[in-house]
Amino acid sequence: MLVAVLLIAGSGAVPSAVAAGAYEAASASTTVTYCSDGGQAQTLDMYEPLGGAALHPLLLVVHGGYWSVGDSAVSQQSQFTQAVMSGAVAAGFAVASINYRLAPANRWPAQIIDTRCAVRYLRATATRWHIDPHEFAALGDSAGGQLVSLDALSAQREQQWDSAQYAGQSTALQAVVDCWGIVDLTAPGWSRLGRGLSTNAFRVPLGSPSAVLRSASPVSHVGPGAPPFLIIHGLSDTLVPPRQSTELRTLLRAAGDAATLVEVANAGHGLATTAVPMVPALSDLAGQTVSWLLATLR
């Protein structure tokens, strides 16, 4: 049952920081089409907290997979993302996890077009989902981190990435959780695997001096007025170099924007761990993330 999966998957329990929340269960509406750019219907899974009359803040979840693989299903998310999703619903958030067009069948910028269209769809249908259109947060990991960060930093600019659907709605986000995101696509130091996978979407490998990669890099769009960022990265990540997150934090702060970086010891890509426990522990980090979202939006 989807309700049970959302509430217990990953960490085995709602993170302690939000265990006492007013919302103890969720209803799930699956296979909801949000956009159909390029003639391809894209769906999202919406999880709504039960109880309470107030409008809910929204957490948009965008999966990773080097723009080529992945799925909106809870079971396909990292253990950390699953824990944040369950904690967010327990804390009163509506959570929307999206699919988007994947490479190589769909080249860039299909992925950012779909992500931005999802934000606009959710604002257009805010009444249906009982969500506050002024309290939109997004969490993405790896390529998903690139997508949510790029949307947040380009906001109403870069209209070439806008679908014709829901054209009157804003793509703005009020908070971003960037988890080990790919934020500087032109930087050196990528693994052979990463360079190879990226060609599926961009036709050129990461690290190339390409105008397309530069435009797709969130760091190219940093400026004053960005929403608050919580950036999380495992220090043992060999697929996305941790300095990607350090660079983003530095640039955001230099522009006068709020940015917090959490560097997780003994954790690789996706916060994968070995025999040595990660620090902070996953359940603690998930609870802290939900608390940050609450403090930032409320």
Q: What do these predicted ranges mean?
A:
Residues 278-298:
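Catalytic active-site module of serine/aspartate enzymes centered on a nucleophile-bearing elbow/loop
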Residues 21-54:
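N-terminal cap/lid segment of alpha/beta-hydrolase-fold proteins
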Residues 37, 153-155, 181, 185-221, ...:
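Mobile cap/lid helix-loop segments that gate and shape the active-site cleft of serine hydrolases
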Residues 52-56, 65-107:
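Short substrate-entry loop that stabilizes the transition state in hydrolases
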Residues 120-190:
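Primarily recognizes the serine-hydrolase "nucleophile elbow" in alpha/beta-hydrolase
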Residues 238-247:
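Conserved alpha/beta-hydrolase "acid-adjacent" motif
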Residues 106-126:
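Alpha/beta-hydrolase active-site loop
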Residues 225, 231-233, 237:
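Short beta-strand/loop motif that positions the catalytic acidic residue
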